[in-house]
């Protein structure tokens, strides 16, 4: 991010240490590179010179002329409502929490510890509930009817087993028929041989004719 907190007239600053630590002031004039003339009419800080080391610049800027009187500074402060805006910032909330923690006793710290444990337990239980709900939404069919799906899977497996057997039998049947056909083919082969044998006696038929002539 671009740095925008520059030292200028009207810039509101937070006093980090010194006699006015924890208060807000507005820069009225710049004396030199180390000091500035500041005024805090609404924070009970009189106009005085203050080193920049004591100040931390904020994002708030007031509109008043150079070296303006306290009256104009107060009017600009109230018009911008700096006090409420500052109280709503994270910076002010952290400072307040740090101060509150520094003032805590042992019993207060014990109560805080017990409260944190209860909070963590509640959060953990809620997270588990949300995780279970997410799982149920992700798999609505599997979660409610696991038994039905198991039975359906068993039935499908049982149905597949005889189907496989039938297909195996159907595959084996043609394999058995093929050798049968081959056997018949082998048996048919001798038939022509027998026919050839029959042709031989047909060729021998002239023998009786010869015997007829002799007769």
From Swiss-Prot:
GO cellular component: cytoplasm; cytosol; cytosolic large ribosomal subunit; cytosolic ribosome; extracellular exosome; membrane; postsynaptic density
A Pfam short name: Ribosomal_L14e
2 X 3 AA tandem repeats of K-[GA]-Q: annotated span: 193-198
Single GO biological process annotation from the record: translation
Subunit structure and binding partners: Component of the large ribosomal subunit.
Function noted in UniProt: Component of the large ribosomal subunit. The ribosome is a large ribonucleoprotein complex responsible for the synthesis of proteins in the cell.
Protein's recorded name: Large ribosomal subunit protein eL14
Lineage, opening ranks: Eukaryota, Metazoa, Chordata, Craniata, Vertebrata
Encoding gene, per UniProt annotation: RPL14
